[in-house]
Amino acid sequence: MIGRLRGIIIEKQPPLVLIEVGGVGYEVHMPMTCFYELPEAGQEAIVFTHFVVREDAQLLYGFNNKQERTLFKELIKTNGVGPKLALAILSGMSAQQFVNAVEREEVGALVKLPGIGKKTAERLIVEMKDRFKGLHGDLFTPAADLVLTSPASPATDDAEQEAVAALVALGYKPQEASRMVSKIARTDASSETLIREALRAAL
C-alpha cells in the first residue's frame, strides 16, 4: 500500500501529476482543488495517496492532506460513486465545501457537479451525513469555507486545450467542456486558472 509520496514534480498535466521518488516516476490523479496547491515542476511535493486496484489498471489518487484523503475514501464507499466520480466531486468543490453542502442538504449545489443527478445527490447526503458524525475530528469544521491559493503559472499557447482535456477527464462531455472554457478564456491565463474558473462558473 502506497500511502504517502515525497518527491520532485516532473510534470503537471491536470488532473495528473508525475512525481519522481527514488528514481521512480509515479502518476498520481488529483482533484483539481488539490492540484491548484501543488508547487511548480522541479520542486518537491508531499502527497498523501490512496491506491486503487482494478482489473485493468492500478491507480494512485493523491491529496494534500489526510483529511482530503479520508473524505475521498468515504465517498467511494457510497453506492454508485467510484474513484473517478469522487475525483470529479472534489474537483468541483473543495473538501470543506462538500462537507458543508452535505450537512446543509444542498441538493441543488451537488447536482451541478459532473455525473451527479438528483438521486445520487440525495444518496450522498443521506449516507455521508451519517458518516460525518463519527469523522468530524478527522475531517473539517462545519460551516467554514476552505480558502485555496495556488502558485502562479505562466500561460501557455495550449492552455485552453489542456483545460478542456482536464474537464473531460473529470467527467464532462467534450462539447460541454469546450463551452465551459470558451466562456472564461483569456490569453494570459494558465490551464490551471482556466480549469478553476470554469469549474467555479459551473457551480
From Swiss-Prot:
Which BP terms does GO give this entry? DNA recombination; DNA repair
Q: Which UniProt keywords apply?
A: Cytoplasm, DNA damage, DNA recombination, DNA repair, DNA-binding
List locations, semicolon-separated: Cytoplasm
Q: Which residue intervals make up region (Flexible linker)?
A: 143-154
**What SUPFAM superfamilies does the record tag this protein with?**
DNA helicase RuvA subunit, C-terminal domain, Nucleic acid-binding proteins, RuvA domain 2-like
Region annotation Domain II: residue ranges?
Answer: 65-142
Q: Where is this region: Domain III?
A: 155-203
GO CC annotations, alphabetized: cytoplasm; Holliday junction helicase complex; Holliday junction resolvase complex
Q: Which Cys pairs does UniProt list as disulfide-bonded?
A: none
Using the UniProt annotation, give all residue ranges assigned to the region (Domain I).
1-64
**Record-level Gene Ontology MF annotations:** ATP binding; four-way junction DNA binding; four-way junction helicase activity
Which HAMAP family does the annotation name? DNA_HJ_migration_RuvA (MF_00031)
Q: Which NCBIfam families match?
A: ruvA
Q: Which family does it belong to?
A: Belongs to the RuvA family.
Role played: The RuvA-RuvB-RuvC complex processes Holliday junction (HJ) DNA during genetic recombination and DNA repair, while the RuvA-RuvB complex plays an important role in the rescue of blocked DNA replication forks via replication fork reversal (RFR). RuvA specifically binds to HJ cruciform DNA, conferring on it an open structure. The RuvB hexamer acts as an ATP-dependent pump, pulling dsDNA into and through the RuvAB complex. HJ branch migration allows RuvC to scan DNA until it finds its consensus sequence, where it cleaves and resolves the cruciform DNA.
Q: Quaternary structure per UniProt?
A: Homotetramer. Forms an RuvA(8)-RuvB(12)-Holliday junction (HJ) complex. HJ DNA is sandwiched between 2 RuvA tetramers; dsDNA enters through RuvA and exits via RuvB. An RuvB hexamer assembles on each DNA strand where it exits the tetramer. Each RuvB hexamer is contacted by two RuvA subunits (via domain III) on 2 adjacent RuvB subunits; this complex drives branch migration. In the full resolvosome a probable DNA-RuvA(4)-RuvB(12)-RuvC(2) complex forms which resolves the HJ.
Record remark: domains:
Has three domains with a flexible linker between the domains II and III and assumes an 'L' shape. Domain III is highly mobile and contacts RuvB.
The protein depicted here goes by the name Holliday junction branch migration complex subunit RuvA
Q: Which organism is it from?
A: Shigella sonnei (strain Ss046)
